[in-house]
A protein has these predicted regions:
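Catalytic cores of Mg2+-dependent Asp-rich isoprenoid enzymes
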Residues: 2-101, 110-121, 140-149, 160-175, ...
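Acidic/His metal-coordination segments adjacent to aromatic residues that form catalytic metal sites
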Residues: 122-135, 212-214
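Cofactor-binding active-site loop characterized by glycine-rich and histidine/acidic residues
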Residues: 107
Length: 294
C-alpha cells in the first residue's frame, strides 16, 4: 500500500521510493538540463517530473540500444503495453515504468500523449528522411511539447493549468535545438532529421549528410532551423502571460535554448564535430535567471 508520504513525494521507503530515486539519478546523469530545471519545482512534485523525464529518456534512447529496427519496435511495444495495462496490468519490474504509472495515477495524467510520444519514436528506428518542416514540427510536438504539457499537469496536481499553446511552442524550440546539438551522432549513424524540403532548397541530400560532405548547404539548413527555433521562442514569449506561475518550472529548461543556439553561431562551429554543451555553472546561471524572471 502506498503511504501518504510516498503518495505525495515518492520519498518513503519501499519499491516506489526506489523507483523514483532511480529516475532522479538517471536524469541527473543523462539529462542535466531537465534535472536542474526540475529543482525549481516544489519538492513534493519533483518525483513526478523525474518519472516523466526519465520515461522520455528511456524511449528516446531505444535507437542507441539496438542495431536493427525490429528489436527497437519490440522495446517500444513493451512501453505501449505498460501504458495500456495501467493499474490493471501486471506490475512492471522496470523502475521507470513503476514510477511513471504511479505518477499517471496520482496526477490523473492522460495516456494518449504518453502513447503518442512512444509512437513518434518509431521514426528514430529507421533511416528514413524527415519529409518536411511540418513533419519535423509535428515530431517535436509529440516528443517535446507533449512532455512539457504533461509536466504542467503534474505541477498543477492534475488540474488543467492552461498554457497549452505556450507548451507547444516551447517544446518545438527545445526539440529543434536538441536535434541540432545531436547532429554529429545522428549523421554518424545515418539519421537525418533536417527536413527534406529544407535540404532540397539548399542543394543537399541525405546521402551528402551521412557521408559528411554536406558543405555550405548543411550550414544554411541548420541556420534555417535556428531561425525557426527562435520564432517559436518569440511566440512563447508572446504567450508568457498565459502560463501560470505554478507551472513555469515545466518551461524552465527552454531558457537554455538561446545559449545553445548562440554556441552554434560561434566562429569555428562544425556541425559534424562540435559538441554543443554548457558548463554546469553556465547552466545553473541561465536557469536561475529564468526562474527569477518567471
Amino acid at each position: 500500500m502506498t503511504t501518504e508520504t510516498e503518495h505525495r513525494a515518492g520519498t518513503a521507503p519501499g519499491p516506489l521510493s526506489q523507483a523514483y530515486a532511480h529516475c532522479a539519478a538517471l536524469l541527473r546523469e543523462a539529462d542535466p538540463d531537465r534535472y536542474v530545471a526540475s529543482l525549481y519545482a516544489p519538492e513534493a512534485l519533483r518525483p513526478g517530473l523525474h518519472a516523466l523525464y526519465a520515461f522520455s529518456h528511456e524511449v528516446a534512447r531505444v535507437r542507441e540500444q539496438v542495431s536493427e529496427p525490429l528489436p527497437g519496435e519490440v522495446r517500444l511495444q513493451w512501453w505501449r503495453d505498460v501504458l495500456e495495462g495501467g493499474e490493471g496490468g501486471p506490475a512492471p519490474a522496470h523502475p521507470v515504468a513503476q514510477a511513471l504509472l504511479d505518477t499517471v495515477r496520482r496526477f490523473r495524467l492522460p495516456i494518449a500523449p504518453l502513447s503518442g510520444l512512444v509512437e513518434a519514436r518509431v521514426f528514430d528506428l529507421y533511416d528514413d528522411p524527415m519529409p518536411s518542416l511540418p513533419d519535423l514540427e509535428g515530431y517535436a510536438g509529440e516528443t517535446s511539447s507533449a512532455l512539457i504539457r504533461l509536466a504542467c499537469l503534474v505541477l498543477a496536481q492534475g488540474r488543467d493549468p492552461g498554457g497549452a499553446a505556450a507548451a507547444g511552442h516551447a517544446g518545438v524550440a527545445y526539440a529543434l535545438t536538441g536535434l541540432m546539438r545531436a547532429f554529429p551522432w545522428h549523421a554518424a549513424r545515418g539519421q537525418v532529421y533536417l527536413p527534406a524540403d529544407i535540404l532540397a532548397r539548399n542543394g543537399v541530400t541525405r546521402e551528402d549528410i551521412v557521408r559528411g560532405r554536406g558543405g555550405p548547404g548543411v550550414d544554411y539548413s541548420l541556420k534555417e532551423l535556428r531561425a525557426l527555433a527562435r520564432i517559436h521562442l518569440r511566440k512563447l514569449n508572446d504567450l508568457s502571460a498565459t502560463v501560470p506561475a505554478a507551472i513555469r518550472p515545466a518551461f524552465l529548461a527552454v531558457a537554455l535554448v538561446e545559449p545553445y543556439l548562440k554556441a552554434m553561431e560561434r566562429r569555428g562551429y562544425d556541425p559534424y564535430r562540435s559538441i554543443i554543451t554548457l558548463s554546469p555553472l553556465r547552466r545553473q546561471w541561465a536557469l536561475w535567471r529564468a526562474a527569477r524572471a518567471a
